[in-house]
């Protein structure tokens, strides 16, 4: 089971939490679609800021958007000018009052989504996939990851037949629910077709003592 399922979904409410946090009755489908539109808009507009994930919380009359970025300065701008423009653009898309929080990712080398997107960018620049994967693996281990696994699937190197290649270093305990396993996925759009990239990064175990849970 642990080998097939999304590691974040498997650990929800154990060591991971939801990216969208709100309750809805009859407006559920509208809110889901609104969240999808917001994430797609922000990922496209703030691509150069290195966006890892976007959390959305809804209250009665306002919505809080928390953006996790490797380069928060690009989003905020000089004296907050860029973030003010961004807030206006979002308020034209949705009705509630918008609050935007920017969280800096201090070590993007061990953020699974950013590692996957970095490999994707290298493949689109025609860098050899093995070199890109090995570089990311060694960089993650150097910055404190306890284990990393990268899987690339598709017409690798322009081959006629699609195949899957992977590199792994350290350990990735996919069945251990207390293990903090980060997961990222993206696609590289190459001239030969799309190449899927999955990244698993093990950052250590979240023990009961750390979460203040009494036995």
From Swiss-Prot:
Belongs to the universal ribosomal protein uS3 family. Binds the lower part of the 30S subunit head. Binds mRNA in the 70S ribosome, positioning it for translation. Keywords: Ribonucleoprotein, Ribosomal protein, RNA-binding, rRNA-binding. One of its GO terms (molecular function) is mRNA binding. NCBIfam families: rpsC_bact. InterPro entries: KH_dom, KH_dom-like_a/b, KH_dom_type_2, KH_sf_prok-type, Ribosomal_S3_C_sf, Ribosomal_uS3_bac-typ, Ribosomal_uS3_C, Ribosomal_uS3_CS. This is Small ribosomal subunit protein uS3. Part of the 30S ribosomal subunit. Forms a tight complex with proteins S10 and S14. One of its GO terms (biological process) is translation. PROSITE patterns: KH_TYPE_2 (PS50823), RIBOSOMAL_S3 (PS00548).
